[in-house]
Amino acid sequence: MQLQEIAQKLGCAYEGDPTLEIHSVASLAEARPGELSFLSEARYLPLLEQTQASAVIVEEGLALPCSIACLRGRDPRLLFAQAIELFYQPYRLPVGIHPTAVIDPSVELGEGVAIGPHAVVMEGVKIGDHTQIHPNVTIYPHVRIGSRCQLFANCVIHERTEIGDDCLIHSGAVIGDDGFGHIPLADGSWRRMLQAGRVVLEDNVEVGSNTTIDRAAVGETRIGRGTKIDNLVQIGHGVRTGSHCLIVAQVGIAGSTQLGHHVILAGQCGLAGHLHIGDGVRVAAQTGVTSDVPAGQTVAGYPHQPIAEWRKSMAVQRHLPELQRTLRKLEARVAKLEQNSTDRAPNAKMLEVGVDPETTCSS
C-alpha cells in the first residue's frame, strides 16, 4: 500500500514520496524497510535516527531530527491503531455451523452466524447477526447474544446471561457462573446459597482470557457499555460497573460493589464488597480499596489513600532503615542522660540538707 493511500484512508497529512510502498507495521526498534511505525512522545525522537522503518506516524508540528517519510495527526497512537487494521485482520470462522457442533433445535440464529467445531449451544439461546462462536464454546440455556460478537475458544456462557452487540469474550472466560454465596450454620459448616440472578454485558464490552464474572444471587451483575476487562479478573456477584471502565489484569472486585463511569482499576488491585466507587476514579496497581471512593479521586496503597499522601508515605518508607538507626542512637543518648540524672540525685538530696557528700563518703 502506498504512503498517499494510507494517508487518505487514515484522513491525515503525509510528508515524503507519495508512492512509497508500505507492507506492514512494527515498533520503531524492530521495524524494517517497508514497514510503518509511530512516535508517541517527543522524548523518543532519538530513536528516529536509528530506526529502519520506511515511514513513521508523528504528531502535527513535531520537528524531526532526520529526513524520514511520515504521516501527521493529533493522536499518533490512534492513527497507528487504525493503520494496524489496514494490514492485519484477526481470524474469522467461515459462516455456517461446523458438523461437530451440538445445537439444540430451539436455538435462534441470526444471519451470517458462524459456529465452530465442538461448540455446544443449549435450548432457548438466541444469537444475533454475524456473531462468531469459536471451537469448544459452551452456551447454557436461555442466553441472549447480540450481533457482531466474538466468543473465542473454550469460553463458557452460563444460563440467562445477556450479551449486547459488538462484544468480545476471549478464550477461557466464564460468564454467569454461580456467585460465591454461602451461609454459616450453627455447627460451623456452610450452606450453599443458589444464585438465581444473571449477568448482563452491555454493548461493546470486552472480557479477557480466563476472567470470571459471577451471576448475582438475585438481580443482576452488570458490566456497562464500552467497558474493557483484561485477563484473569474476578468480578463477584451483584457487581455493577458504569460505562467505559478499564479493569486491568488480576483485579478482584467483591460482591455488590458499584463502579461509576470511566473508572480505571490498575493491575492486581482489590476492592472490598458493597462499596461505591465514583465516576472517574483511578485506582493504582496493588491497591486495597476498603471503603467508598468519591468521584475523581486517584488512590493507592493499602488501605487506600489519596495518591499524593501515599507518595509522601513511600518517600518516608525508603528512609526507614536510616530513621531506625537514628532512633536507636537517640534512645541510647536518652538512656545515658537518665542514668546520669539518677546517679546525681542522691548527692543533690544530701546538699539540700547540708551534708557534704565527699565527707560522708570518706567517713
Curated annotation (Swiss-Prot):
Its EC number is 2.3.1.191. Pathway: Bacterial outer membrane biogenesis; LPS lipid A biosynthesis. SUPFAM superfamilies: Trimeric LpxA-like enzymes (SSF51161). The active site is at residue 237. CDD domains: LbH_LpxD (cd03352). The keyword Ribosomal protein does not apply. Pfam families: Hexapep (PF00132), LpxD (PF04613). GO terms for biological process: lipid A biosynthetic process. Keywords: Acyltransferase, Lipid A biosynthesis, Lipid biosynthesis, Lipid metabolism, Repeat, Transferase. Gene3D superfamilies: Hexapeptide repeat proteins, MurE/MurF, N-terminal domain. It catalyses: a UDP-3-O-[(3R)-3-hydroxyacyl]-alpha-D-glucosamine + a (3R)-hydroxyacyl-[ACP] = a UDP-2-N,3-O-bis[(3R)-3-hydroxyacyl]-alpha-D-glucosamine + holo-[ACP] + H(+). One of its GO terms (cellular component) is carboxysome. InterPro entries: Hexapep, LpxD, Trimer_LpxA-like_sf, UDP_GlcNAc_AcTrfase_non-rep. GO terms for molecular function: N-acyltransferase activity; structural constituent of carboxysome shell. Residues 338-363 are annotated as: Disordered. Belongs to the transferase hexapeptide repeat family. LpxD subfamily. Homotrimer. NCBIfam families: lipid_A_lpxD, PRK00892.1. Catalyzes the N-acylation of UDP-3-O-acylglucosamine using 3-hydroxyacyl-ACP as the acyl donor. Is involved in the biosynthesis of lipid A, a phosphorylated glycolipid that anchors the lipopolysaccharide to the outer membrane of the cell. This is UDP-3-O-acylglucosamine N-acyltransferase. It comes from Synechococcus sp. (strain JA-2-3B'a(2-13)) (Cyanobacteria bacterium Yellowstone B-Prime).
